[in-house]
């Protein structure tokens, strides 16, 4: 038997035709135009943080100027002249048996040698600080690389610089997790998740401790000058501690350079984050109304110390931040507020007893 016919279906609107793609006319570029050709930008609105970091890199990139080369050449020529004159004086004093002049030449040679040694030491420490930025760039390249052979040696070098012993549990877990079939990206990624957090946790504890000390000191101290000196001293100590944790030995000039890098990084890249994480929370909770003026100033000083520590941590780390593992200012803010409230409650309850 044949199946019955289905009833007719009437549509209210006619069928829509599929849209046809419209192609633009062919355009041919000349050789002169192809040299100045630039592709159109797909995303014209980059993130503020990326723009700020690019501005920081451009501002901190060393610039070789003619005046600097002339000054360095003059200093080198002056140093060579001093050494040559010292050798001539020593030879004349030896020939004439002028022992007093010979002793003066020996003392001058010791002073010059000590000065040269200190300059070489400072230069080596400054070079080590600059080398950390190159290591961070190399790690960023390895994290996007699919090659094999460089990742393990690079991570072992980082562990040696940080003073992590071969018998450390975190390093042993990393050795157990890697194998020959993994590429550099996977090996460096495992190091970033298994070994690097050990140093990051120590740096976070140092930042929390120094920020809490700054907050409490400002909150209870009545002298503004003492507060300023204390905060400056503690911030420098914090930067030194973080640099030591990550295996960087700071000298005088390298310490100044790192402090300058931290301040410039805050000035360029920290304003938006500081307003976003601090200002809105303060307005919502109205902390200024519930805490005293000194307590509010103490929280501000503690947040500044924490911000310095976070940026010093970022500049001293040999690896870039991965998977949003960068410490946030809000975490330290909540901790500082809790510690300050606890201290104020204890101070109020002690006179009642």
UniProtKB/Swiss-Prot annotation:
Does the record carry Transmembrane helix as a key word? yes
Q: From what superkingdom does this record's organism come?
A: Bacteria
What does the record say about its membrane topology? Multi-pass membrane protein
Q: Does the keyword Transmembrane apply?
A: yes
Annotated keywords: Cell inner membrane, Cell membrane, Membrane, Transmembrane, Transmembrane helix
Name the Pfam families for this protein: DUF697 (PF05128)
What InterPro entries has UniProt attached to this entry? Answer: DUF697 (IPR021147), UPF0283 (IPR006507)
Major localisation: membrane
Compartments where located = Cell inner membrane
Q: Which PANTHER family match?
A: UPF0283 MEMBRANE PROTEIN YCJF
Belongs to which family?
Answer: Belongs to the UPF0283 family.
The protein's name is: UPF0283 membrane protein YcjF
**Organism, as annotated:** Salmonella schwarzengrund (strain CVM19633)
